[in-house]
C-alpha cells in the first residue's frame, strides 16, 4: 500500500468545486477540520442532499459523497421533530447507521478549557454548548464558594 501525501493550504484545500480538491471531491482520502457546536456532528451534514455538486453550486458538507436512503430518512425525520415526539428517537437510529457505515472518522475532539478563581462557584463547562458562559446566571463568588 502506498500513500502520496499532499499538504494544501487552506485556500487551496477549501477551494470551491468542481476543481477544488475537497468540495470538488477530487481525493481518495482527506483529513480536514470540521467545526461542531454539539457533542457530535449534525446528521444533516452527511445526507445525500449535502454532497457538493453542480446542482447545489458545489456547497455541501458531505464531501465524502456518503449516500444511504435509510440514514437520510431517519435524519430528516429526527431534525423535523421535537424532543417529546416519538420521531425524535430517530436521532439514535441515524447515529447507529452512521456508526455502522462510518462515512467520516473523527480523529480528535476539540478540548474545552477554562479557568476560574478558587472562590468562584457555579461554573462548569457544558459539553453541549459552545459558550463557556452558558450558565452565567448560576455564577457566584466569595467566602461561601471556597473549596
Located regions from the model:
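Short helix-initiation/N-cap motifs at beta->coil->alpha
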Residues: 4-19
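Detector for C-terminal structural segments
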Residues: 18-147
Amino acid at each position: 500500500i502506498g500513500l502520496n501525501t499532499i499538504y494544501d493550504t487552506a485556500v487551496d484545500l477549501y477551494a470551491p468545486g468542481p476543481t477544488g480538491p475537497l468540495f470538488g471531491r477530487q481525493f481518495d482520502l482527506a483529513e480536514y477540520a470540521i467545526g461542531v457546536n454539539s457533542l457530535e456532528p449534525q446528521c444533516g451534514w452527511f445526507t445525500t442532499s449535502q454532497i457538493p455538486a453542480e446542482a447545489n453550486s458545489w456547497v455541501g458538507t458531505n464531501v465524502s459523497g456518503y449516500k444511504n436512503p435509510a440514514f437520510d430518512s431517519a435524519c430528516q425525520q429526527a431534525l423535523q421533530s421535537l424532543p417529546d415526539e416519538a420521531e425524535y428517537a430517530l436521532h439514535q437510529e441515524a447515529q447507529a447507521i452512521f456508526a455502522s457505515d462510518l462515512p467520516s472518522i473523527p480523529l480528535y475532539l476539540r478540548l474545552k478549557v477554562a479557568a476560574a478563581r478558587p472562590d468562584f462557584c457555579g461554573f462548569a463547562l457544558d459539553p453541549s454548548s459552545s459558550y463557556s458562559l452558558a450558565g452565567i446566571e448560576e455564577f457566584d463568588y466569595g467566602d461561601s464558594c471556597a473549596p
